[in-house]
C-alpha cells in the first residue's frame, strides 16, 4: 500500500501498514464490519497488538494500536483516508487523522461540569497523549535514540497519569478545550423564572 504525503502523517506509516499486512495474520473474517475490507493483525514483542484495516469502499487505511500503556488502556487509531473521486470532487484530497480515548469536559449547566471519557484526536501523532513509538520501532526496525527514549517515557507517564489521576484529567481537558468559564451570558435568562418574580 502506498499513500499520499499528507500533513501530520508519519513518514513510517506506509512501512508499518505494509509490514503488518506481510507479517501479520489475516483476521478479516473475525473483524470485518463491511464487505470490501481487508484486516491484518500483528502481535508485537511487548504484547501490544497492531491491526490494519484497508477499506476499499471509503478509501481508508486504518491502524489500531492496542496497548496497556495507552490512555485508559483503550486503542489508538491512526487513519489515512482519501475519498473516492466522484462528479462533485474528481480529485479528492487525502487526510490523516488520529484518535484515542481521553477526558472531555462537558457543561450541563452553570454549576454542573463533568469530565467524561470520549474520543479525542487530531491530525498528527503529536496530538495524541498515548505513546506510539513502538509502532515506529516496528515499522522501521530501528531502535529509538536516547532523546526519543526520554520523550517516549514522558509520554507514557503522561498517559498513565491521565488514566489514573483526576487532576491530570482536568489538566488534559484544559489543554484541549481551554479553561471552563461558566459566565451567565451562556445561559438563558427571563422566561418563567422572571415572570414568577425569582
Task: Name every feature range the model reports, one short phrase each.
Residues 1-198:
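Short low-complexity linker/loop segments enriched in small residues
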Amino acid at each position: 500500500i502506498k499513500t499520499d504525503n499528507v500533513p501530520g502523517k508519519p513518514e513510517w506509516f506506509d512501512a508499518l501498514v505494509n509490514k503488518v499486512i506481510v507479517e501479520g495474520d489475516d483476521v478479516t473474517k473475525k473483524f470485518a464490519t463491511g464487505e470490501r475490507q481487508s484486516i491484518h493483525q500483528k502481535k508485537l514483542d511487548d504484547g501490544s497488538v497492531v491491526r490494519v484495516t484497508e477499506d476499499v469502499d471509503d478509501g481508508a487505511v486504518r491502524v489500531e494500536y492496542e496497548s496497556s500503556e495507552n490512555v485508559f488502556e483503550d486503542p489508538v487509531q491512526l487513519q489515512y483516508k482519501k475519498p473516492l473521486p466522484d462528479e462533485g470532487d474528481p480529485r479528492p484530497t487525502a487526510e490523516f487523522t488520529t484518535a484515542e480515548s481521553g477526558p472531555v469536559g462537558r457543561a450541563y449547566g452553570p454549576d454542573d461540569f463533568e469530565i467524561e471519557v470520549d474520543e479525542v484526536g487530531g491530525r498528527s501523532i503529536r496530538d495524541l497523549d498515548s505513546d506510539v513509538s513502538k509502532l515506529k520501532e516496528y515499522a522501521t526496525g530501528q531502535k529509538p535514540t536516547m532523546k526519543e527514549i526520554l520523550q517516549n517515557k514522558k509520554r507514557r507517564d503522561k498517559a498513565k497519569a491521565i488514566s489514573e489521576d483526576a487532576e491530570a484529567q482536568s489538566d488534559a481537558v484544559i489543554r484541549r478545550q481551554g479553561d471552563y468559564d461558566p459566565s451567565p451570558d451562556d445561559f438563558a435568562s427571563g422566561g418563567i423564572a422572571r415572570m414568577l418574580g425569582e
